[in-house]
A protein has these predicted regions:
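Active-site mouth of glycoside hydrolases
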Residues: 1-12, 16-17, 143
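Substrate-binding clefts and catalytic carboxylate motifs of secreted carbohydrate-active enzymes
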Residues: 20, 30-205
Length: 208
């Protein structure tokens, strides 16, 4: 309908232009792919993040329903690889989770500890992303993490598992998207503290 005027309200790239963080929406998967550390979530910038995420394993109580045998309860068992949302890339995907855990936290001692550590890692990573997006308010006007739930029991980016259990990420997301956010950012040995508000009236605060 060339005679009808259309004005996009979200950041818009325009027809035929290449992907750019300066206009339009943006998908950020460099961390999940294993090519960047989780702190990269703080360094990227875009007008609108429409996809970004990080994986974790299922809760043990959910996992034992499809991996009841002890031999199945290994990160690289056939069952665990079948229940990895990246499919053909499952070995690498699970390996990346383990590598990021070892890069950021004490080594888990048990299989259960590894599952839990993956939840902490996922929550910490996405918290970095959300807070960075919100600190950049005015340039960045959208932040949609991937993903809310699962359609089957699987290791994935979801914040709620197939059984309906909230992972640590879901609690963090709820807090990180509150209408007021106090967020610290360290760079070049400097600590910057931001007060971000989505309320309609200006607000002041005192940092104690």
């Amino acid at each position: 309908c060339p005679e009808i005027c259309y004005q996009p309200s979200s950041p818009f790239r325009g027809y035929g232009k290449n992907k750019s963080p300066y206009e339009g929406d943006y998908h950020s998967w460099s961390v999940l792919s294993g090519s960047k550390p989780i702190t990269y979530f703080e360094e990227g910038f875009s007008r609108f993040y429409s996809e970004y995420g990080y994986e974790s394993f299922d809760y043990y109580e959910s996992l034992v329903k499809y991996a009841p045998r002890k031999e199945d309860q290994s990160i690289y068992s056939d069952v665990m690889l079948w229940h990895q949302r990246q499919g053909y890339n499952a070995i690498r995907a699970n390996g990346n989770i383990i590598r990021y855990i070892s890069d950021n936290y004490p080594a888990p001692k048990t299989f259960k500890d590894t599952l839990y550590a993956s939840h902490v890692l996922q929550a910490d990573a996405i918290k970095l992303a959300i807070e960075a997006h919100r600190r950049n308010k005015g340039f960045c006007w959208g932040s949609l993490y991937w993903q809310l739930g699962n359609c089957w029991p699987v290791s994935s980016d979801s914040s709620i598992d197939y059984e309906g259990n909230w992972k640590g990420l879901h609690y963090i997301v709820k807090k990180a998207f509150e209408d007021r956010l106090v967020s610290g950012y360290i760079h070049n040995d400097t600590l910057d503290v931001y007060l971000v508000t989505d309320r309609l009236k200006p607000e002041n605060g005192v940092l104690d």
